[in-house]
Amino acid sequence: MIKLFTDTSANLPIELIHKHNIQVVPFEYTVDGVTAEYSAETDFDGIAFYNAMRSGADIKTCLINMGKFTEGFVPELEAGNDIIYVGMSGGISSTASVAAITAGELMEKYPQRRILAFDTYAASLGEGLMLLKLSLIHI
């Protein structure tokens, strides 16, 4: 079986994530020193976030690290599943590159499994739409 992964930048509604059995790796962000995790299960208040940005709040976003990818990928690999990760544009974030590096290391430990990490060259619903299309044809 193939397990699909993405990050929260795909901005997919939770109903579609569950319907298509997609695993979402969360981003973290900080607003004025307060760190939050933007996960698929969390209500992200985009209006408040961008209003804070416009008003000059100190905002930082965090790259998803290898540990978070490993934490998500390993249970699927151990269950005998291959993985396709569909990520945000490398022009915006290095997250897809980190996923690819993680994939390379994990395929050495699980040589019978395949992990493909894609940079979509898109973000938000552009990334999400690619993922949904893939979910319909990947089986």
Residue ranges and their predicted role:
Residues 82-90, 116-119, 133:
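Short glycine-rich or small-residue beta-strand-to-loop segments that form or flank ligand, phosphate
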Residues 3-68:
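N-terminal glycine-rich anion-binding loop in soluble enzyme alpha/beta folds
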Residues 9-10, 29, 88, 120-122:
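Short, ordered loop/turn segments at secondary-structure junctions
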Residues 71-83:
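Glycine-rich phosphate/diphosphate-binding loops that line cofactor/substrate pockets in enzymes
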